[in-house]
Amino acid sequence: MTTRFSTPANYYWGELFRRFFGGQEWKNLMSEAASVSRPRYSSDFRFSDGVILSRKTFGESTGESFVREFSLLLTFPKTYEVCKLCGVAMELALNGMNRLSDYNVSEFNIVDVKTVGCKFNIQSVTEFVKKINGNVAEPSLVEHCWSLSNSCGELINPKDTKRFVSLIFKGKDLAESTDEAIVSSSYLDYLSHCLNLYETCNLSSNSGKKSLYDEFLKHVIDYLENSDLEYRSPSDNPLVAGILYDMCFEYNTLKSTYLKNIESFDCFLSLYLPLLSEVFSMNWERPAPDVRLLFELDAAELLLKVPTINMHDSTFLYKNKLRYLESYFEDDSNELIKVKVDSLLTRDNPELKLAQRWVGFHCYYGVFRTAQTRKVKRDAEYKLPPALGEFVINMSGVEEFFEELQKKMPSISVRRRFCGSLSHEAFSVFKRFGVGFPPITRLNVPVKYSYLNVDYYRHVKRVGLTQDELTILSNIEFDVAEMCCEREVALQARRAQRGEKPFQGWKGTKNEISPHARSSIRVKKNNDSLLNILWKDVGARSQRRLNPLHRKH
């Protein structure tokens, strides 16, 4: 009874070669088989369960399919050599290949190497060592003797080097020869595999996968430009290309998100760059570039986890609540930006240490603020105050990055959101070195709390702040909203005086008070003195003083 052939479930390209040849050699053998154009298997093939793979099916096989790999296995000369060595017909050896689930998929078997396949066990070797060593059996000597004896096929004294040489080198001339011995090298086999892999990737059937690999590897080429390797394209050096394709094949290295790209590049730096340096004696003519600058950070990555957005008013549904996009920014997004910003700070300020770079960053945006747009551009350089060392930090690259990011994300104040996410770090610096900023509201913020006069107050992380700090930030937020409302009312009044219809086409002033602030709680009574100081001579309504806003996180 015959059955129509169907591809086995869970089959993947290379599985047949791995199952037949096993070990670590199957990849090299498969590359060798695929690198040469071979005729398809020209007969029908019957599997042991009655399934027939027709000659026509072999002829029509393409791509990375079961039939094409099976055809390669059938026509590969080394398959026949292995079967001949084992004394079995090739058709008989391969007739169960369509039943993949019947075989153990693991390449490794856990065995006791001290007993399985050994002519001499540890016990017998221990007794032998005692006889030749004055009834003393040191563990290291026993281990050495056990290895030598099982290698040579007889119990051998580890100190008897002449006997060992005579057993290994059968001829006297060879045993006494001083010529350099030539041995096979898995190192050379690997390089040969890389050359075969380069040829395989250049086959038309692999053009799609090759283009995906090349999309990532062009960044490797950019990285190597500062070296003397002179590698600008795969055709410049097929061996280098093969090594890089091996990395892509082994670690599924494709161009992805910003952080994933950096992670993949770390694999190249730790595993494959040392290999290239050893094979080609590569040297650096100029310092290697910062990996973080090789890849662009796409604005779309920052909002990958945001649910569907209403493009009309930039709102979306999040945890059963309607929220503005401005109020939502993933911690993952902040981490992406932080990695990119630090790379730009490092590039533009190579003489500054990590701590100096970020102290300068926080002070810069404390002084120049974080508004989306400005009539006067922020200074490219900023000199820090004496308490912080009076060093100069170059912020031009960071500003260009934020400008481009802001254009692509107009609904979000990128600088403000990002600085708010790092507020705990910034406030720690400001408090330690006594850094403060001019007020941004009418409030009388005490001098010791002047570091809270930042314009990203709405996005400050509330965790870890004192009760006084929470009170000040909440009242700053309220007073800014109050001033915006008063300014809008005054503007509309002037329009009315000019005979224009006030509020014409106006949909209302955007409520600057955050959703967190609206769900406020009454501040403890021991903060009354601070509230009186904040609102003294400001003219705010009494009910606001008695029930100030306080955000919870």
Swiss-Prot record:
Q: Where would you say this protein principally sits, based on its record? A: virion
Q: Name one GO biological process term.
A: transport of virus in host, cell to cell
Location relative to the cell:
Virion
Sorted alphabetically, the Gene Ontology cellular component annotations on this record are: virion component
Q: Specify whether Transport is a keyword of the entry.
A: yes
Keywords (A to Z) from UniProt: Transport, Viral movement protein, Virion
Kindly indicate whether the keyword Glycosyltransferase belongs to this entry. no
State one Pfam family annotation: Viral_Hsp90
Instruction: Write out the function statement from the record.
Output: Movement protein that is involved in local cell-cell movement via plamodesmata. At least five viral proteins, CP, CPm, p6, p64 and Hsp70h are essential for cell-cell movement. Also plays a role in virion formation. Together with Hsp70h and CPm, encapsidates the 5'-terminal portion of the viral genome.
Which named protein is this?
64 kDa protein
Q: Which organism is it from?
A: Beet yellows virus (isolate Ukraine) (BYV)
